[in-house]
């Protein structure tokens, strides 16, 4: 696993061991970031795993990323990857589940330019996260949510509007923005 583009292009990333982890394939990651064109501001990498999506965003110019994963080993891998690339100052890393993390973020009154959702497949975790992101108004007015999920899953987009949807074999990605009725 590696960084695809930007300041840290081709740098290797440590990944998680085990059957329950599923790192984002390079072609999916490249497709996501090519469709975004540019990244900037503040990002949230929820269900971060190895941190590959948030680190890719930092490499491509995002100012800061908050990484969240409930797995202790994942948090250690994220911290190691950030340290290796000297990105610690541009990041915050938390061991927490998505529900509690989103509630804590809401209390900090933070809004994000980009939110990456790449949870374990087929657990309805994206639906729960999108519901809270909408309820807590965590996405900036022109922000984008990037969801990666199994093509077997049906995603409830709540108040968000679909910008683009891509299919990569068994993986689908969805880019969402605030709907017009959220103004």
Give the location of each predicted region:
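Class I S-adenosyl-L-methionine-dependent methyltransferase catalytic core
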Residues: 1-183
């Amino acid at each position: 696993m590696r960084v695809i583009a930007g300041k840290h292009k081709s740098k290797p990333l440590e990944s998680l061991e085990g059957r329950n982890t599923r790192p984002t394939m390079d072609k999916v990651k490249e497709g996501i970031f090519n469709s975004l064109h540019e990244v900037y501001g503040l990002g949230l990498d929820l269900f971060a795993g190895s941190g590959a999506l948030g680190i890719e965003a930092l490499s491509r110019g995002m100012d800061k990323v908050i990484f969240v994963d409930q797995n202790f080993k994942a948090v250690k891998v994220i911290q190691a990857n950030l340290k290796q690339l000297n990105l610690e100052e541009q990041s915050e890393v938390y061991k927490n589940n998505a529900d509690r993390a989103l509630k804590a973020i809401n209390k900090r009154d933070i809004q994000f330019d980009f939110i990456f959702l790449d949870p374990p497949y087929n657990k309805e975790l994206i639906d729960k996260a999108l519901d809270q992101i909408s309820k807590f108004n965590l996405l900036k007015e022109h922000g984008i949510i990037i969801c990666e999920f199994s093509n077997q899953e049906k995603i409830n987009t709540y108040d968000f509007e679909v910008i683009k949807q891509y299919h990569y074999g068994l993986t689908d990605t969805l880019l969402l923005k605030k709907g017009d009725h959220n103004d």
